[in-house]
């Protein structure tokens, strides 16, 4: 034979993969046509490209790669078919929506919502999770070429396949570690913010009588100028104004009645220190400029 196991496996994988990818593109083209000509909403091409990259390709890679690897090891297509159907149902029904979508190999549960305003809100999560699935699928394909004994294969081809397996598994492991570290940090942040909110719940807060927000959208960030009238509770005076603001937004300037005021941040809690206490039921004007994601 003039070709190796690697050529044979790649031919099978690309043949099946291109067939499914072609069907996917046909379906997306039909949906895009309906979206473009029959839906009274602005047309955006980005969701179709991103869905193909993060939805279709990793799923094809991991399902086809794992299938050919199991066939090579178990040498029973019927058994592999049953195992793959069981795995698909397990990921679709039981594991897909759990563990931060890490086992959602079909891409059915993980959010892929596109916004004209902010784009993909979870781009980092998609790259890490779906990148892990893609690399694992490629590693399975290379391992199939390495373990198959159908055709003779040169030493260089074996070394290439082994290098691909090690590289892809290493990359998938690194992405997985980054992902779980980020999820752990996010969980810790939510717990910390919940505890801070529980403590702040006992603190008297001003109420907003009126507010004016000037929002400037700058790519993936926003710049906001806020002009608010705040009123103290009727029964208590305030020497500190307790406000809440997304921790991803950084306060650049803050003033009380057009005079600069000092403030402190504790995650989402913003404490504005007043030069003189705000009497009960009295009002005050606060201006603030902040920006961030």
Predicted regions and their residues:
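Short helix-to-coil transition segments within interhelical loops
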Residues: 1-7
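Surface-exposed beta-strand/loop patches in extracellular or lumenal glycoproteins
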Residues: 228-248
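A surface-exposed beta-strand-loop module
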Residues: 237-238, 248-293
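Terminal transmembrane helical anchor/hairpin motif
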Residues: 77-156, 177-195
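Membrane-helix interface segments
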Residues: 4, 45, 76-81
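Secretory targeting signals
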Residues: 10-75, 108-128
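N-terminal, polar/Ser/Thr-rich
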Residues: 45, 158-222
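Short, well-ordered beta-strand segments enriched in hydrophobic/aromatic residues
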Residues: 222-232, 288
């Amino acid at each position: 034979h003039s070709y190796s196991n690697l050529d044979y496996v790649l031919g099978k994988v690309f043949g099946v993969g291109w067939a499914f990818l072609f069907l996917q593109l046909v379906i997306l083209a039909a949906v895009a046509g309906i979206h473009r000509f029959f839906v009274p909403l602005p047309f955006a091409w980005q969701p179709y490209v991103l869905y193909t990259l993060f939805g279709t390709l990793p799923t094809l890679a991991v399902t086809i790669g794992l299938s050919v690897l199991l066939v090579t090891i178990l040498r029973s297509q019927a058994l592999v078919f049953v195992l793959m159907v069981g795995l698909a149902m397990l990921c679709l029904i039981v594991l897909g929506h759990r563990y931060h979508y890490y086992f959602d190999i079909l891409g059915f549960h993980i959010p892929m919502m596109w916004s004209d305003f902010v784009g993909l809100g979870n781009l980092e999560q998609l790259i890490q999770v779906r990148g892990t699935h893609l690399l694992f699928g490629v590693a399975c394909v290379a391992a199939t070429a390495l373990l198959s004994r159908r055709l003779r294969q040169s030493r260089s081809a074996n070394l290439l396949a082994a290098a691909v397996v090690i590289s892809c598994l290493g990359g998938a492991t690194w992405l997985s570690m980054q992902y779980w570290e980020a999820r752990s940090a996010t969980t810790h942040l939510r717990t910390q913010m919940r505890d801070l909110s529980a403590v702040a719940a006992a603190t008297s807060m001003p109420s907003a009588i009126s507010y004016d927000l000037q929002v400037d959208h700058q790519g993936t960030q926003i710049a906001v100028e806020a002009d608010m009238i705040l009123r103290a509770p009727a029964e208590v005076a305030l020497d500190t104004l307790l406000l809440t603001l997304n921790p991803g937004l950084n306060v650049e300037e803050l003033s009380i009645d057009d005079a600069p005021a000092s403030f402190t941040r504790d995650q989402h809690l913003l404490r504005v220190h007043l030069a003189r206490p705000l009497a009960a039921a009295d009002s005050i004007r606060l201006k603030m400029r902040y920006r961030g994601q």
